[in-house]
Amino acid sequence: MRTLWIVALLLVGVEGSVLELGKMILQETGKNAITSYGSYGCNCGWGHRGQPKDATDRCCFVHKCCYKKLTDCNHKTDRYSYSWKNKAIICEEKNPCLKEMCECDKAVAICLRENLDTYNKKYKAYFKLKCKKPDTC
């Protein structure tokens, strides 16, 4: 029962496409998005603080750049629809901006899967103040 209460509290703070993104990452990598990538390197999770530490961190950097291109929707509050068919993510949105947001999330999930071999536990809870000079998109 205590575990259910903790999960409920965590979900209260989750908005918009974060839920969909988390599902995509789990489906593509087998890893929990929050515990594995929530504070990974300089660019995964909240904050965009510096040059990527490795290829995994670069996936998150490119994802943030993709989100910056979205002008008509908000990745923090807007939600989209997608499906998982034959181990593939299918963005099903009719709304162009929501479809693009879904494509951004799909791309990062695939990138993280393709770079699982670069995942380094020393960057899992990286102290972001160590990050230097942000890369530009």
Swiss-Prot record:
Disulfide bonds join 42-131, 44-60, 59-111, 65-137, 66-104, 73-97, 91-102. Residues 1-16 form the signal peptide. The record marks 121, 124 as: Important residue of the cationic membrane-docking site (MDoS). PROSITE patterns: PA2_ASP, PA2_HIS. The record marks 127 as: Hydrophobic membrane-disruption site (MDiS). SMART domains: PA2c. One of its GO terms (cellular component) is extracellular region. Expressed by the venom gland. One of its GO terms (molecular function) is calcium-dependent phospholipase A2 activity. The record marks 128, 133 as: Cationic membrane-docking site (MDoS). It holds the Pfam family Phospholip_A2_1. InterPro entries: PLipase_A2, PLipase_A2_Asp_AS, PLipase_A2_dom, PLipase_A2_dom_sf, PLipase_A2_His_AS. Keywords: Disulfide bond, Myotoxin, Secreted, Signal, Toxin. The keyword Disulfide bond applies. Its main location: secreted. It is found in: Secreted. Residues 121-133 are annotated as: Important for membrane-damaging activities in eukaryotes and bacteria. Snake venom phospholipase A2 (PLA2) that lacks enzymatic activity. Does not show antibacterial activity. Is myotoxic and displays edema-inducing activities. A model of myotoxic mechanism has been proposed: an apo Lys49-PLA2 is activated by the entrance of a hydrophobic molecule (e.g. fatty acid) at the hydrophobic channel of the protein leading to a reorientation of a monomer. Monomer. Belongs to the phospholipase A2 family. Group II subfamily. K49 sub-subfamily. This is Basic phospholipase A2 homolog APL-K49. It comes from Agkistrodon piscivorus leucostoma (Western cottonmouth).
